[in-house]
Amino acid sequence: MKKLCYFINSDWYFDLHWTDRAIAARDAGYEIHIISHFVDDKIAEKFRTLGFVYHNIPLVAQSFNVLIFFRAFSKARKIIQNINPDLLHCITIKPCLIGGFLAKSTHRPVILSFVGLGRVFSAESACLKLLRSFTVMAYKYIASNKCSLFMFEHDKDRAKLADLVGIDYKQTIVIDGAG
């Protein structure tokens, strides 16, 4: 059975916007894994009941703490190595960075879903500008994985990131939003 692994920063967001897609993939024959920061036991139980395998990870969406980020990176690497998914689908900026980097280093197919570009690409503080430059460098590395697809909900976000990173438009797609 093929394995599809979703990687997202929050359990409630996946439950609200992505569960139907995961059910469709399950019904198409995929074993579904979800890596997230699970804080709601009811959501975890719902996923288990649906036949999904969930993996908890210490990823905090709004945190800029580098130690938390690298701890999440290390845990995600171990989880993804153990799952060995046929496709990794990363949703939101931190999972896209972590999962995209791991997919590139293992030549794994990956979808990177951007529901927006977030503060890193819109704020003008010196700290966020520095973080933006590191993020752009990381996405350049990730985009060199020819098995990567950058998925956006808005043409404007695709154009901005593609221009900053130099992503080949053949590696991008714009879809209707998940909401």
Task: Go through each PLM region and give its residues.
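An amphipathic, basic-hydrophobic alpha-helix
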Residues: P58-L87, L97-F101, S105, S133-Y141
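Active-site proximal beta-strand in glycosyltransferases
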Residues: K3-C5, A103-F121, M151, I173
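A short, histidine- and acid-enriched strand-loop-helix "catalytic/donor-clamping" loop
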Residues: N9-F14, V60-F64, R108-K129, I142
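Short His-centered aromatic/hydrophobic patch
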Residues: C90-C96, F114
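Membrane-proximal helix-turn-helix segments that form the acceptor-binding/catalytic region
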Residues: I23-A28, S74-R77, L130-F150
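N-terminal strand-loop element at the rim of the active site
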Residues: Y6-L67, D157, T172
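Donor nucleotide-sugar binding/catalytic pocket of nucleotide-sugar-dependent glycosyltransferases
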Residues: H55, V136-G179
